[in-house]
Curated annotation (Swiss-Prot):
This is Phosphoglycolate phosphatase. CDD domains: HAD_Pase. The active site is at D8 (nucleophile). The keyword Glycoprotein does not apply. Keywords: Carbohydrate metabolism, Hydrolase, Magnesium, Metal-binding. Substrate binds at K155.
Length: 232
């Protein structure tokens, strides 16, 4: 029996302009009120996720920075899963390389990140991976940003820790997302789903893909798996 939902945000709870879907928010509130633990899981910062948990209406548990940080409930302390130093050193190499080409990397929320580096998708991600080949880092393309973090960190690994601390088995969760950074999380959940705008590799490992994209697709899937709550 499903007791929880772990969901990506950008591209999953939003529309094509990255605006939060009000239908998705209302659905999450109904799930939470119906006894389903909803966990937000994102590549974004803990600062943003703390606010979103409160404003959307979850129980306060989140995974941020693609698994690099997490918090259990509103009263929990934020935990950091990775050493950011190696990501910063990798960034220094990239800035030197691209600087010689007259390209300046646009960093995202640099001062608010504890475990990773994120920057705009203005350079080819495969080139970044090639430049950092042999480094103990992982490069993640979320469709919204390129992320660098210590090797071995991802949403799926941290999800196992979060599930244990919540007292809910991973196979009692429905996982849903749209990008490559969601694959580990979707695989770790008992039921894995994606929205219609998902990348092909995400669609290939999902149990079900919605017929409509973005937040409306999220709502479709939640209604399919939780009719006893959302039919009210």
């Amino acid at each position: 029996m499903l007791r929880g939902v772990i969901t990506d945000i950008d591209g999953t709870l939003t529309d094509e302009k990255r605006r939060l879907s009000t239908a998705a928010i209302e659905t999450i509130r109904k799930l939470q009120e119906g006894g389903i633990e909803v966990v937000l899981s994102s590549g974004n910062t803990s600062c943003l996720l703390k606010g979103l948990c409160k404003l959307i209406g979850t129980g306060g548990t989140f995974i941020g920075e693609n698994g690099g940080v997490y918090r259990i409930g509103f009263q929990g302390s934020m935990q950091v899963m990775a050493n950011r130093d190696i990501a910063v050193k990798a960034l220094n190499l990239l800035e030197e390389y691209y600087g010689k080409k007259g390209i300046r990397l646009e960093l995202y929320s640099h001062q608010e990140r504890y475990s990773d580096i994120a920057f705009a998708r203005e350079v080819p991600v495969e080139e970044v991976r090639s430049l950092l080949s042999g480094w103990p880092v992982d490069i993640m393309d979320t469709n919204f940003a390129i992320h660098i973090h210590e090797a071995g960190i991802d949403k799926g690994r941290t999800f196992h820790i979060v599930a244990e601390q919540l007292g809910i088995k991973p196979d009692e969760f429905l996982g849903i997302g749209d990008s490559e950074n969601d694959i580990g999380m979707i695989k770790a959940a008992g039921t894995g789903c994606c929205v219609a705008n998902a990348q092909e590799d995400v669609r290939n490992i999902s149990d079900y893909c919605s017929s409509v994209p973005y937040g409306e697709g999220f709502v479709e899937i939640m209604r399919m798996y939780f009719p006893h709550i959302l039919a009210r």
